[in-house]
C-alpha cells in the first residue's frame, strides 16, 4: 500500500511502551543481586575420570602415560604356531584381544614419545609392538589352518556320513530289545557327530535349521520307526496299524514327532498316536519347500517348552495342564512327570 501524500491523510501512530516501562526493560532484580565469582583456573586436579572410562584401555595398569622401555622383558618371545594349535577357539579369541589391547598401548606410547621429539629413543616400543604383532599373525595362521581343514572335511563328509549311516543302520534296527538304552545313547552320539543335531531340544540352542538338519530328522525318525514299528501294543496289535501303515511319516512335522520319541516300543507307539491325532484333524501336509522354516519353528518351540518344564521340575511345581504338557513337551520328558 502506498502512503498518501495528501495533507488530510491520517497520521499513523507509533507503538510505544506505556509508562512506567516493564521490569524486563528496566532491569531484573535477580541479575542485580547476582555476584560473579572469580574464574577457576583449569588444573588436572579438578578433572575426575572414572576408572570405568573406556579410554583407560589405552593405558597400562598403573595408568602411566608412557612406560619406561627398560621395564619391558626382552627375553620374551611371541607365541609359536605349534603352541597355538593346542589352544581352543575361546583361548585364541581371548589371546587375540589381549594382544590387540597391548598393541594399542604401545602405539600410543610411541606416538607420545614422537610428539615429545624422542623418536630416536622409542625403539623399545616398536620392537615390543612387533613381537605382539607376530603372535597375532600366528593366531591368524592357526585359524586359517582350521578353516581349511573344515572346508576339506565338508567335501568328504557326505560320503563318510553315508558309509557310517549304512553301518549303524543294520546295528540299530536288528539289535535285541535288551540293548534299547545303549542304542539310544549311540544314536544320540551318531546324530550329534555327523549332523550336529540332538534329540534333546535343550542341546539345540542356537541351531539354524538347514538341509543337513532336515536330513538328520528324517534319518532318526526312519531308524526309530523301522526298529519299533513291528512291535505290538498291550492288546497284541501291531503299533504300526494306527491308521497310517502306507504313509508312516508324511511330512516334516510327523517326522519330527517320531524323531523326538523315546527309544522304546512305548515311546514310538506314543509318537504314532500323536501322529494319528494330527492326521485326524485333517491338516494340510507341510510342503517340502517350507520344511526348513517349519522345523526351525518347531525346534525353538520345543526348546522353550523343555526349559519351562525343567524349571518346573527343579522348583517341584508344575503349573501346566495335562493337555499343555502333551502338546508342548517332547516325549522324552513325559516320563519325568511326578507319579502320584
UniProtKB/Swiss-Prot annotation:
GO terms for cellular component: mitochondrial large ribosomal subunit. It is found in: Mitochondrion. Residues 1-22 are annotated as: Disordered. It comes from the Eukaryota. GO terms for molecular function: structural constituent of ribosome. Residues 1-10 have a biased composition (Polar residues). Keywords: Mitochondrion, Ribonucleoprotein, Ribosomal protein, Transit peptide. One of its GO terms (biological process) is mitochondrial translation. Pfam families: MRP-L47. Belongs to the universal ribosomal protein uL29 family. Component of the mitochondrial large ribosomal subunit. Mature mitochondrial ribosomes consist of a small (37S) and a large (54S) subunit. The 37S subunit contains at least 33 different proteins and 1 molecule of RNA (15S). The 54S subunit contains at least 45 different proteins and 1 molecule of RNA (21S). This is Large ribosomal subunit protein uL29m. It comes from Yarrowia lipolytica (strain CLIB 122 / E 150) (Yeast). The gene is MRPL4.
